[in-house]
Amino acid sequence: APATYAIDPTHTFATFEIDHNGASTNRVRFKSGTVEFDRXAKAETNGGDFEARIDRNAFGV
């Protein structure tokens, strides 16, 4: 069965970057959210499932 983990804002965070035609890079850091990981599916499908849910209002630039 999948396990759900919370993003711990004091130890971890999720980020992404947007490149603007090489002129600048915007970086976004999400401060909260959850991650769901199914270890059994990883073993069965040689990759598994990974899902992240992040509140779009919970980010800092």
Curated annotation (Swiss-Prot):
Induction: By the herbicide dichlorprop [(R)-2-(2,4-dichlorophenoxy)propionate].
Superkingdom assignment: Bacteria
InterPro entries to which the protein is assigned, alphabetical: Lipid/polyisoprenoid-bd_YceI, TTHA0802/YceI-like_sf
SUPFAM superfamilies in the cross-refs: YceI-like
Gene3D superfamilies registered for this protein in UniProt: Lipid/polyisoprenoid-binding, YceI-like (2.40.128.110)
Transmembrane intervals: none
Misc. comment: On the 2D-gel the determined pI of this protein is: 6.99, its MW is: 20.9 kDa.
Family: Belongs to the UPF0312 family.
Record-given protein name: UPF0312 protein
Species: Delftia acidovorans
